[in-house]
Amino acid sequence: MGVKSFDEGRIKSAEVIQLITLYNLFSRKESRNIIFQGGTALRWFHGNERFSEDLDFVTSLSMTELTGLLNSLAVSIETGIKAQFGPGAFTLRQKDRGREGSVTAFVEYASEGQRGKTMVKLEFERLKAGASPGQEQVILSSAPAVSYFIRTGQVMFPPGRVVNIETVEEIFSDKIRALLERRYLKG
C-alpha cells in the first residue's frame, strides 16, 4: 500500500479548488440544507492549519436531489477553476460507494502541460430524520484562512457567500465518535 505524497504546489492547487467548490456549492438555494463539517471545515473556518484533502458535508437533501445539485454545479465549478488556473481538463464525477444515504464526488483538474491531476473529494452523508447538528453561518471570504488566500491573489471570487458550517464542538464530537466506532487503526 503506497503512501500519498503531496507537494506544496499540489496542496495549494487542491486548496484553491476546495474554495472554488465551496463558493459555488453555497451559491445555490439548496445549500440551505447542507452543512460543511470535518477536518477541512476546521482548516478554513476554525484556525487549524493542517491540510485536509476532503470536503465533508451532512445534508437533509435526498440523495436524488443532491445528485442533481452536483450535476448542475459542474459548469460553474469548471468556469471558476479555469479562470484561476487556465485551460485544462476538468471532471466532476460521482462514485457509488454502495452506502445508502451517502454520495461521494470528485472534482478533478489538470492544467495544460501539468503532469497528473489535482483532485478534491466531496463526501455527503444524509442526516438522520430530526437531527440538527450545531452549526453557524459564516461569510466565506471573512474566514481568516480564506481571506489570506484572497489577499495574496491565490484565489479570486466575489465576497459575500455564506457557508453553513458545523461548530467546532460538533466537529470534535464527530471526530471522537468516528474514533470510537472505527474498526481499524488509521495512520
Regions found by a protein language model. Give the residues of each.
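Helical scaffold of the NTase/Pol beta-like nucleotidyltransferase catalytic core
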Residues: 1-35
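Catalytic metal-binding acidic patch
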Residues: 39, 46-70
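Conserved catalytic core of two-metal-ion nucleotidyltransferases
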Residues: 78-125, 162, 167-170, 174, ...
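Catalytic cores of NTP-dependent nucleotidyl/adenyl transfer enzymes across multiple folds
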Residues: 19, 23, 116-187
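Short secondary-structure junction/hinge motifs that connect adjacent elements
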Residues: 33-43
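Signature of the catalytic double-stranded beta-helix
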Residues: 64-84
